[in-house]
């Protein structure tokens, strides 16, 4: 006799689905009158365009606005790119260095997945004709290998200087002022693996032993520490990339370069590039330690650092003991659909390296919310707990801003890493097995990402981005440039008009 199946039948599945819909409706009714942050999900509706004429107008509008944003930043890009020393023989050079760099940036703006795809797609006659209409500076498009050979020979760090100049220009123009936290620029830092191989293709690669079916095997990988501006509206602007390198470690003791060592180098570069910029660092649970706090204080940086349960036991002991004596250090609020309860203790002394001391402030947020259980269809209460070390004393009037609008948006950089890995920027693709060229492509990718982010959060394009999603918008623009949609006279008139970037 066979055992009865535990698998749900069709009737049970339909009943569960009906139960979930009822529970979700109940939650929506309970949230009535509460302002909910809009989600990132794109529209599920049919196209609002009624005929070919409307589609043509929409396509030209999207392309022209995207290109106007790019061309608005073009003088800064060209000025800095022109400073890069070109090692090639001028008499034998067909393409200027600036043209090759712009070509590389555009290949990432349009999300070309490889050098081969860039060759195949961007050299099509219609694409070239439209690209020349949009960018008259591009008299002809090079072969991708020409760009690769150039990146092998130049100082590619200068490409990242272009990125920093672009961001510095936006800061000077006060484009980010509405997103600042107590007058400071929130910068999130996080490390991630770029890609790995089973063979040593460059001496700079880090190495590790991984288990295989036939025994242990050496693996060689590239790891990068990224720093980006992380604003509370979700906008994340790339800043600096610090590559970990085998040569930066201690080769005599087989101690490799690590994220904390890379952070010291990144912090020095960040201070060098933005000497007077008021900064609020957002760091994860790897960073709450004396040397990192010392770097922040010496550079006059504020910080919000994730404090995990196992970190800084002496600080946790002080917090648990003092919070009972400070019942006034508490704050409750309803934020979106969550009930939040904050407790904090200021001026905790943290000792490290024998005689060194830092004063830190600890805050713990416990929150609860209701959601539909996907297994039962019932409304259940969920809870979570977050703790941070703060560089400034905590008070009821700054707790929401520092925790919800700053510290929690450290996750922006994790979302950014997910985007560049999975949403078309080919972060994990090795565009060249030359270390210098590989880094050069990485910096070009970050520039392309920045331009797309500015378009995504611009007032003139926000409606179509919300309709199609970010990837859908980029595909929409790329397909338009690939086809016979553009009216040359209208495009030239549109691009000739004055333009000012306005962010939402």
Language model region names:
Residues 2-4, 65, 83-84, 123-125, ...:
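A short, flexible helix-boundary coil/loop motif
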Residues 67-102, 148:
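Basic, short loop/linker segments at the boundary and entry of helix-turn-helix/winged-helix-like folds
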Residues 103, 118-119, 143, 147, ...:
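Short, conserved catalytic/metal-binding motifs centered on acidic residues
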Residues 148-233:
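Active-site-proximal, Lys/Arg-enriched surface segment
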Residues 211-278:
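Electropositive, glycine- and tryptophan-enriched low-complexity nucleic-acid-binding patches
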